[in-house]
Amino acid sequence: MAGLKNTSYNAVHWSQLAPEEQIRFWEDYEAGRATTFLVEPERKRTKRRRGEHSTKPKCENPSWYRPERYKALSGQLGHAYNRLVKKDPVTGEQSLRMHMSLHPFYVQKRTYAGRKYAFRPEKQRLLDTIWPVLVSFSDAVTHTVGMSVSRLAREISPKDSKGKVIPELEVTVSRLSRLLAEQVRFGVLGVSEETLWDRETRQRLPRYVWITPAGWQMLGVDMVKLHEQQQKRLRESEIRQQLIREGVLREDEDISVHAARKRWYLQRSQDALKHRRAKAAASKRARRLKKLPADQQIHEMAEYLRKRLPPDEAYFCSDDHLKRLAIRELRQLELTLAAPPPH
């Protein structure tokens, strides 16, 4: 038996075939073309071929721990982080205490999430790295991770001495996005309900994830205490106070976690739109000014700044000071000026 080819996964017995295929099988058997009663299914004809390129990720072994300058997490969030990460009392070196990729939950829900096999080693290491980041930047009110997927990818990517991401070793956004989408299918993460389309930049607005109760249970936190702490922070949250000021809520009314999370995401989307609009306007202004000579650039920028200064500040602003502001603004737009900046 050891020498036989294992065809139990892709071959079927002739009796399980359709009547027409059974007739064709016995014709082949009598003609000597069939030598076994197990029939392999006909493979689909496709032009797809395995390429010669490498499929290994740029960053095979990512690592991230909460920096010392960060304030320690309080309550059950701190308990969850301490269950994930341990610190050597002698050397102060941090390392993983719990590998989330080996949690039995992923084995139990494997079929439910659409997987057949366990995680590959490179995905295990990425999953072990991302969970401390998710807990570390989780909001105590909504349990929403305060970073978009692209910012999370930059956070865990290796950086050089200047703090910039090394392109050859980065954790790509697409790789992390696929991992988080799979965690959503497992039910341990939730994702923002809708992703708005920005017509100006032809890009979607950032997506945010939040840790579900199933995710917190995996981390081993006290769910009763976690709920009590969340409700307390929810009553004191700026989102609730803002709704009270707008007249949407009364002083004695509480806001649900779902409503607070939706309000939080709406605010983040508006902030992203404002930032993109300002960036697009600055880029358009830079392209227009780049065609002008240096002195004309300074004049145009000075007039632009004069119109946007507060009235009291514009009244006392001298031409020399306005010129310095214009040159500084032009250099921020990365325009090359012939004259050096004034000292």
UniProtKB/Swiss-Prot annotation:
The keyword Cell membrane does not apply. The keyword Manganese does not apply. Residues 42-61 are annotated as: Disordered. One of its GO terms (biological process) is DNA replication. InterPro entries: Plasmid_replication_init_RepA (IPR003446). Keywords: DNA replication, Plasmid. This is Replication initiation protein. The gene is repA.
